[in-house]
Amino acid sequence: MNKFKNIAVYGGGSFGTSLASLAAQNCNNVTLFLRDEAIAKEILHNKTNVKYLGDIKLPAHLQATTNLDIIKDFELIIIALPSYAFDDSIKLLKTHSISKDNTLLIATKGFARNPTALLSDRLKTLLPYNPTAFFVGPNLAKELAKNLPASASIASLDIDIANKIAYNLSSKIFTTNVSSDIVTLQVAGALKNIFAIKSGIDLARKQGENARATLIVAALKEIAILSKALGGMQKNSDILLEGVVGDLVLTCYSLGSRNTKFGYELGISSDKKKFLQEYKELAEGREALKLVLDLIKKYNLHMPIISEVASCVIPYVIPAKAGMT
């Protein structure tokens, strides 16, 4: 199977930088594209991204730039940006003349906005001709950057594209599996952050490990409910992929997860309204909640965990008996 001659990663946060580090294990021509000139220079000269990854050393041959004009020259472009920036970022790529020859790997987790939709559906209107796949896995950014063992699922409607990307990213310590169910992986990647908030709240309440295991099972059921409503889950076994079960378990069990941390700090807060107003860190699950509520309403779905978290995080959106006091 052919190797990509070069790989671009678009997004210089913790996850984007970690994915660039991962890609550089197998490819000698990897460039990280980001907006912050100072961080780009730091990566070039010091091989660190202290703001997002501390003092973790990045591969010596990893390049970094703020010049999007050259991104069209890369065979594989990995998109690793927050979901709220997805539309604008893809439109920006279009202005820099990427063509149907550029393969896209979407590592963004969440839903497109205005209107609420799967990222794959939004791409059909923005970049309909590019080979596209989705990357979801149980991956804490700092562990990826440290080259610790991990895995991920690569999904594409074109299974040959998924296999090629998997081949280019896999190694002895990073394993991949492929799937054609792009819907289930996208849904799982978005919802797991909301379930992690619930896990953090339960941790603050000292609910115990039995409750957390029960949450995992219930969360998988809700992932399946929304996935089927959006056209996924043609095979029940798709729920067992690393990008579904693995990512859900990792996110819900780790305080290294921004969303679990957010839920925990919300749970121990004595003034929840003030906490929610003043909390500045990005918690993707908080961002995704209103979008998921749109889909629940549109398809008339019963997803009680999502409703409970909404009652905690978006006061008065849904009157739920299980809401926090």
Curated annotation (Swiss-Prot):
Record's catalysed reaction(s): sn-glycerol 3-phosphate + NAD(+) = dihydroxyacetone phosphate + NADH + H(+); sn-glycerol 3-phosphate + NADP(+) = dihydroxyacetone phosphate + NADPH + H(+)
Residues binding sn-glycerol 3-phosphate: 109, 137, 192, 247, 257-259
GO BP terms: carbohydrate metabolic process; glycerol-3-phosphate biosynthetic process; glycerol-3-phosphate catabolic process; glycerophospholipid metabolic process; phospholipid biosynthetic process
GO molecular function: glycerol-3-phosphate dehydrogenase [NAD(P)+] activity; NAD binding
Compartment(s) of residence: Cytoplasm
Main enzyme class: oxidoreductase
Major localization class: cytoplasm
Active site, renumbered: 192 (proton acceptor)
Pfam hit, one: NAD_Gly3P_dh_C
UniProt EC number: 1.1.1.94
Record keywords: Cytoplasm, Lipid biosynthesis, Lipid metabolism, NAD, NADP, Nucleotide-binding, Oxidoreductase, Phospholipid biosynthesis, Phospholipid metabolism
Residues reported in the UniProt entry to bind NADPH: 14-15, 35, 109, 141, 258, 282, 284
Annotated pathway: Membrane lipid metabolism; glycerophospholipid metabolism
rRNA-binding found in the keyword field: no
GO CC, any one term: cytosol
Family: Belongs to the NAD-dependent glycerol-3-phosphate dehydrogenase family.
Annotated function: Catalyzes the reduction of the glycolytic intermediate dihydroxyacetone phosphate (DHAP) to sn-glycerol 3-phosphate (G3P), the key precursor for phospholipid synthesis.
Name this polypeptide is given: Glycerol-3-phosphate dehydrogenase [NAD(P)+]
